[in-house]
Regions:
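Accessory interaction regions appended to the cores of large information-processing enzymes
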Residues: 1-183
Length: 183
Protein backbone atom coordinates (compact mmCIF):
# COMPACT_ATOMS: atom_id res chain seq x y z
CA UNK A 1 0.00 0.00 0.00
CA UNK A 2 1.31 3.48 -0.85
CA UNK A 3 0.47 6.59 1.13
CA UNK A 4 0.96 10.13 -0.03
CA UNK A 5 0.38 13.47 1.60
CA UNK A 6 -3.29 14.41 1.43
CA UNK A 7 -4.13 17.69 -0.26
CA UNK A 8 -6.96 19.28 1.69
CA UNK A 9 -9.31 21.28 -0.57
CA UNK A 10 -9.41 24.51 1.43
CA UNK A 11 -11.22 27.51 -0.04
CA UNK A 12 -11.13 31.19 0.85
CA UNK A 13 -13.88 33.80 1.03
CA UNK A 14 -14.62 37.14 2.69
CA UNK A 15 -16.86 38.19 5.59
CA UNK A 16 -17.42 41.89 4.91
CA UNK A 17 -17.44 44.46 2.11
CA UNK A 18 -14.34 46.44 1.15
CA UNK A 19 -13.33 48.91 -1.54
CA UNK A 20 -10.00 49.42 -3.22
CA UNK A 21 -8.49 51.06 -6.24
CA UNK A 22 -5.29 50.47 -8.11
CA UNK A 23 -3.51 52.53 -10.74
CA UNK A 24 -1.21 50.64 -13.08
CA UNK A 25 1.16 53.09 -14.75
CA UNK A 26 4.29 52.12 -16.64
CA UNK A 27 6.20 54.37 -18.99
CA UNK A 28 9.28 53.27 -20.91
CA UNK A 29 10.09 55.28 -24.00
CA UNK A 30 7.23 54.63 -26.43
CA UNK A 31 3.63 53.89 -25.63
CA UNK A 32 3.24 53.08 -21.96
CA UNK A 33 0.66 51.25 -19.90
CA UNK A 34 -2.09 52.94 -17.93
CA UNK A 35 -5.23 51.67 -16.27
CA UNK A 36 -6.98 52.58 -13.04
CA UNK A 37 -9.79 50.57 -11.46
CA UNK A 38 -12.07 51.24 -8.49
CA UNK A 39 -14.01 48.28 -7.13
CA UNK A 40 -16.09 47.10 -4.23
CA UNK A 41 -16.11 43.46 -3.19
CA UNK A 42 -18.67 41.82 -0.92
CA UNK A 43 -19.54 38.34 0.29
CA UNK A 44 -22.07 36.88 -2.14
CA UNK A 45 -25.11 34.79 -1.27
CA UNK A 46 -28.21 33.70 -3.20
CA UNK A 47 -31.01 36.31 -3.27
CA UNK A 48 -28.75 39.25 -2.47
CA UNK A 49 -30.00 42.77 -3.36
CA UNK A 50 -28.26 44.85 -6.03
CA UNK A 51 -25.16 46.81 -4.88
CA UNK A 52 -26.24 49.77 -2.73
CA UNK A 53 -25.45 53.25 -4.01
CA UNK A 54 -24.27 52.11 -7.45
CA UNK A 55 -25.91 52.26 -10.87
CA UNK A 56 -25.88 48.75 -12.31
CA UNK A 57 -25.22 48.67 -16.06
CA UNK A 58 -24.48 44.97 -16.37
CA UNK A 59 -24.26 41.79 -14.30
CA UNK A 60 -22.60 38.45 -15.02
CA UNK A 61 -22.72 35.35 -12.81
CA UNK A 62 -19.92 32.81 -13.12
CA UNK A 63 -20.18 29.30 -11.67
CA UNK A 64 -16.63 28.55 -10.61
CA UNK A 65 -15.05 25.18 -11.46
CA UNK A 66 -13.94 24.77 -7.83
CA UNK A 67 -17.38 25.56 -6.37
CA UNK A 68 -19.13 28.78 -5.50
CA UNK A 69 -19.78 31.81 -7.66
CA UNK A 70 -18.35 35.10 -8.79
CA UNK A 71 -20.93 37.80 -9.48
CA UNK A 72 -19.37 40.60 -11.55
CA UNK A 73 -21.13 43.97 -11.85
CA UNK A 74 -20.43 46.78 -14.31
CA UNK A 75 -21.40 49.95 -12.43
CA UNK A 76 -19.33 52.41 -14.47
CA UNK A 77 -21.14 55.57 -15.52
CA UNK A 78 -19.96 58.43 -17.68
CA UNK A 79 -17.48 56.40 -19.73
CA UNK A 80 -14.70 56.48 -17.12
CA UNK A 81 -13.53 53.13 -18.53
CA UNK A 82 -14.44 51.77 -21.98
CA UNK A 83 -16.60 48.65 -21.86
CA UNK A 84 -13.94 46.87 -23.94
CA UNK A 85 -11.65 46.82 -20.88
CA UNK A 86 -14.15 45.08 -18.57
CA UNK A 87 -13.19 41.55 -19.76
CA UNK A 88 -9.57 42.38 -18.93
CA UNK A 89 -10.52 43.53 -15.42
CA UNK A 90 -12.51 40.31 -15.01
CA UNK A 91 -9.47 38.27 -16.14
CA UNK A 92 -7.35 39.94 -13.47
CA UNK A 93 -9.96 39.23 -10.79
CA UNK A 94 -10.31 35.59 -11.90
CA UNK A 95 -6.53 35.14 -11.91
CA UNK A 96 -6.35 36.30 -8.30
CA UNK A 97 -9.31 34.06 -7.36
CA UNK A 98 -7.22 31.04 -8.39
CA UNK A 99 -4.82 31.78 -5.54
CA UNK A 100 -6.22 33.49 -2.44
CA UNK A 101 -3.89 35.43 -0.14
CA UNK A 102 -4.35 33.30 3.00
CA UNK A 103 -3.51 29.75 1.92
CA UNK A 104 -3.16 30.03 -1.84
CA UNK A 105 -6.50 28.22 -2.19
CA UNK A 106 -9.32 29.06 -4.57
CA UNK A 107 -11.59 31.99 -3.66
CA UNK A 108 -15.37 31.55 -3.83
CA UNK A 109 -18.69 33.37 -3.32
CA UNK A 110 -17.66 36.97 -3.98
CA UNK A 111 -19.48 39.86 -5.62
CA UNK A 112 -17.28 42.38 -7.44
CA UNK A 113 -18.65 45.78 -8.49
CA UNK A 114 -16.40 47.86 -10.75
CA UNK A 115 -17.68 51.42 -10.38
CA UNK A 116 -14.98 53.84 -11.54
CA UNK A 117 -11.55 54.20 -13.03
CA UNK A 118 -9.44 56.10 -15.48
CA UNK A 119 -7.95 55.39 -18.86
CA UNK A 120 -5.58 57.10 -21.27
CA UNK A 121 -6.36 57.42 -24.99
CA UNK A 122 -2.92 56.09 -26.01
CA UNK A 123 -1.45 54.17 -23.07
CA UNK A 124 -4.49 52.16 -21.93
CA UNK A 125 -4.61 48.54 -23.06
CA UNK A 126 -5.91 45.16 -21.95
CA UNK A 127 -2.84 44.18 -19.92
CA UNK A 128 -2.97 47.47 -17.99
CA UNK A 129 -6.55 46.84 -16.93
CA UNK A 130 -5.91 43.17 -16.16
CA UNK A 131 -3.11 44.16 -13.78
CA UNK A 132 -5.18 46.99 -12.26
CA UNK A 133 -8.15 44.63 -11.74
CA UNK A 134 -5.96 41.93 -10.17
CA UNK A 135 -4.25 44.36 -7.78
CA UNK A 136 -7.46 46.18 -6.80
CA UNK A 137 -9.09 42.81 -6.04
CA UNK A 138 -6.05 41.71 -4.01
CA UNK A 139 -6.12 44.89 -1.92
CA UNK A 140 -9.88 44.77 -1.36
CA UNK A 141 -9.77 41.06 -0.46
CA UNK A 142 -7.20 41.66 2.26
CA UNK A 143 -9.40 44.41 3.78
CA UNK A 144 -12.61 42.33 3.59
CA UNK A 145 -11.92 40.06 6.59
CA UNK A 146 -10.88 36.99 4.58
CA UNK A 147 -11.39 33.54 6.03
CA UNK A 148 -10.36 29.99 5.21
CA UNK A 149 -13.16 27.50 4.56
CA UNK A 150 -12.32 23.97 5.64
CA UNK A 151 -14.01 20.95 4.08
CA UNK A 152 -16.41 18.87 6.13
CA UNK A 153 -16.73 15.17 5.38
CA UNK A 154 -19.04 12.55 6.82
CA UNK A 155 -17.21 9.30 7.38
CA UNK A 156 -18.03 5.91 8.83
CA UNK A 157 -15.27 4.23 10.80
CA UNK A 158 -15.32 0.48 11.40
CA UNK A 159 -12.92 -0.82 14.06
CA UNK A 160 -12.53 -3.50 16.74
CA UNK A 161 -14.17 -2.61 20.07
CA UNK A 162 -10.87 -2.50 21.95
CA UNK A 163 -9.63 0.37 19.69
CA UNK A 164 -12.80 2.50 19.95
CA UNK A 165 -11.43 4.83 22.65
CA UNK A 166 -8.15 5.48 20.84
CA UNK A 167 -9.90 6.13 17.53
CA UNK A 168 -12.46 8.48 19.11
CA UNK A 169 -9.62 10.38 20.79
CA UNK A 170 -7.79 10.68 17.49
CA UNK A 171 -10.90 11.93 15.66
CA UNK A 172 -11.62 14.51 18.36
CA UNK A 173 -8.00 15.73 18.31
CA UNK A 174 -8.61 16.52 14.62
CA UNK A 175 -11.83 18.42 15.43
CA UNK A 176 -13.97 15.45 14.41
CA UNK A 177 -17.47 15.15 15.82
CA UNK A 178 -18.74 11.68 16.64
CA UNK A 179 -22.47 11.57 15.88
CA UNK A 180 -23.14 8.03 17.04
CA UNK A 181 -21.73 4.60 17.77
CA UNK A 182 -22.94 1.06 17.14
CA UNK A 183 -21.47 -2.09 18.59
Amino acid sequence: MKFSKTRIPYRETIRKAAEANYRHKKQSGGAGQFGEVYMRIEPWYEGMAEPAGLTVRGRDVYNLDWGGKLVFYNCIVGGAIDARFLPSILKGVMEKMHEGPLTGSYVRDVRVSVYDGKMHPVDSNDISFKIAGLQAFRQAFQQADPQVLEPINHVEVLCPEDLTGAIMGDLQSRRGIVEGMDT
